[in-house]
From Swiss-Prot:
Location(s), subcellular: Cytoplasm; Nucleus
Any one Gene Ontology cellular component term annotated for this protein: cytoplasm
Keywords from the UniProt entry: Activator, Chromatin regulator, Cytoplasm, DNA damage, DNA repair, Nucleus, Transcription, Transcription regulation
Organism: Kluyveromyces lactis (strain ATCC 8585 / CBS 2359 / DSM 70799 / NBRC 1267 / NRRL Y-1140 / WM37)
Protein name: Protein AF-9 homolog
Length: 220
């Protein structure tokens, strides 16, 4: 007996959909929400989004964020866009994120973690604050920890494939824009930074190799 259409998968085919996930955070100062505990110092938002701000609810059913157990009702279920939540706190911790896909997908949920970042990174060499690569309209007093990823659906069922094809969700812009920094341009910039870093490390290794050689053989 042939499998029902909902479970019939399209062999040797994969479909990808880009997402960004992460958090923004800033010190509350005197603007403390009325229900925030007195020891909380930061206001933060964690999210799962499309890199260009497009709708992703056509293939994502819900997103579940599991916060630190000290929060009331730490398991937060977001069943409609935007898939995000805002809270207050004083410390950084791991947030478990689970993405559930549309019912017709017949796909398992996607499970991963994000380290909630409240404080900026300080470059140990320059002693200056390092800004995130995603600099799209981020105030100076705001911390942003955002990551790009692609969800890969291998051999999707026919109905889900049709759903995914109903919207062009895999377009990747060539250049950065004020509202979308993730692009081929950013990808190339990251590759260039890696090459520069690799050359620097190779140079330092050669220096240490020479020092080690001289230490072992003073006549070298």
């Amino acid at each position: 007996m042939p499998a029902p259409p909902v479970t019939k998968r399209i062999k040797t085919l994969s479909v990808t959909r880009p997402i960004i996930y992460g958090n923004t955070a800033k010190k509350m100062g005197d603007n403390i929400p009325p229900n925030a505990p007195k020891d909380h110092t930061h206001l933060w938002t964690i999210f799962v989004r499309d890199p260009r701000g497009e709708d992703i609810s056509y293939f994502i059913k819900k997103v579940v964020f599991k916060l630190h157990e000290t929060y009331p009702n730490p398991v937060r279920v977001i069943e409609a866009p935007p898939f995000e939540l805002t809270e207050t706190g004083w410390g950084e911790f791991e947030i478990n994120i689970k993405i559930y896909f549309a019912d017709v997908s017949n796909e398992k949920m996607l499970n991963f973690y994000h380290h909630l970042r409240l404080h900026p990174y300080i470059n140990p060499e320059t002693k200056e604050i390092e800004r995130s690569n995603d600099e799209s309209e981020v105030p100076e007093d705001e911390v942003k920890a955002v990551y790009f990823d692609e969800i890969v659906f291998n051999e999707p069922v026919e109905q889900f494939f049709q759903l995914l094809m109903s919207k062009p969700g895999n377009l990747f812009p060539s250049n950065k824009t004020p509202t979308c920094v993730f692009s081929r341009q950013l990808e190339q910039e990251e590759i260039d930074r890696i090459h520069i870093g690799t050359k620097k490390i190779d140079k330092e290794i050669k220096v240490y190799e020479q020092k080690l050689k001289e230490a072992m053989d003073p006549n070298a």
